[in-house]
Amino acid sequence: MSNTEHNVESKNVTDTLDEILRLQEDIQARIGSSNHNLETNFESIKDFVSRAHAYIPILNQISKDMIEICERTQALKKKTSQLELSDTNIEDGSTTSTPTTTNKSQ
């Protein structure tokens, strides 16, 4: 192998190694960017889960309150219906009246 051939071969190897180095740097930059995106997304997810956990007791209380409101509404509807029947009986001259019960919690 002559000195010229050796120099050409050496240049080809150097060029190939330079290309490999550029590709490695490019891959490293992409991976770094991906890692940054993953870290950012992970922080966003952690924040979301943290806020969701904070709302669970509030939602549970709202659910209990809604059930209580529905129960009270049904009791008021029943009482209204009984009062309407009582008024109807009085207007008809009927002597019977329907007893009404009062709920102290209302």
Curated annotation (Swiss-Prot):
GO terms for molecular function: protein homodimerization activity. Residues 78-106 are annotated as: Disordered. GO terms for biological process: endosomal transport; positive regulation of gut granule assembly; positive regulation of intracellular protein transport. Keywords: Cytoplasm, Endosome. Residues 82-93 have a biased composition (Polar residues). It is found in: Cytoplasm; Endosome. Residues 94-106 have a biased composition (Low complexity). It comes from the Eukaryota. One of its GO terms (cellular component) is BLOC complex. Belongs to the BLOC1S6 family. Homodimer (isoform 1). Component of the biogenesis of lysosome-related organelles complex-1 (BLOC-1) composed at least of blos-1, blos-2, blos-4, dsbn-1, glo-2, mutd-1 and snpn-1. Isoform 1 interacts with blos-1 and blos-4. Component of the biogenesis of lysosome-related organelles complex-1 (BLOC-1) involved in gut granule biogenesis. This is Biogenesis of lysosome-related organelles complex 1 subunit 6. It comes from Caenorhabditis elegans. The lineage of its organism: Eukaryota, Metazoa, Ecdysozoa, Nematoda, Chromadorea.
